[in-house]
Amino acid sequence: MEAVSQLAVEMAEDCRQRGYEVNVKLVEIGALLHDIGRARTHSVHHAVAGAEIAKQLGLPEQVIRIIKRHVGGGITQKEARKLGWPKDIYTPETIEEKIVSYADKLIEGARRVPINRTIKELSQELPPPAIERIWKLHEEMLTLVGDCECPP
């Protein structure tokens, strides 16, 4: 999680230098806690479990939203219903949510990896619309921070 946080903070600072309004501290905290739900499960459900843990701890709503919206390029309401999740928004909306979600896609263990590698791996388990959302997030982040990933 520390690697995700470090990359997310770099991205947030890059965004701020480009004139975007970004809460860098929120990005850092959200990135450090984005996988807190893995204490309960290592499945996709860790996003909802993490949001529950964060609520129980009394964390700010902005942090809770980062935790529950970081999975993939977001989870649609239809997908959330199929997963049995509470009705809510599970797609990153704010710049801080998008930064953490994207940074998470570029880190494997403690190493930075190319987005193509992440997408290739996720393509084995996710349907095409979910992969398309990750590509869309990637394209949006390229416009915000440029190419911040490692070489292939």
Predicted feature residues:
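His-Asp-centered metal-binding catalytic motifs of divalent-metal-dependent phosphohydrolases/nucleases
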Residues: 4, 22-57, 64-74
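Divalent metal-dependent phosphate-bond-processing catalytic cores, especially two-metal-ion Mg2+/Mn2+ enzymes
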Residues: 1-22, 33, 56-59, 78-152
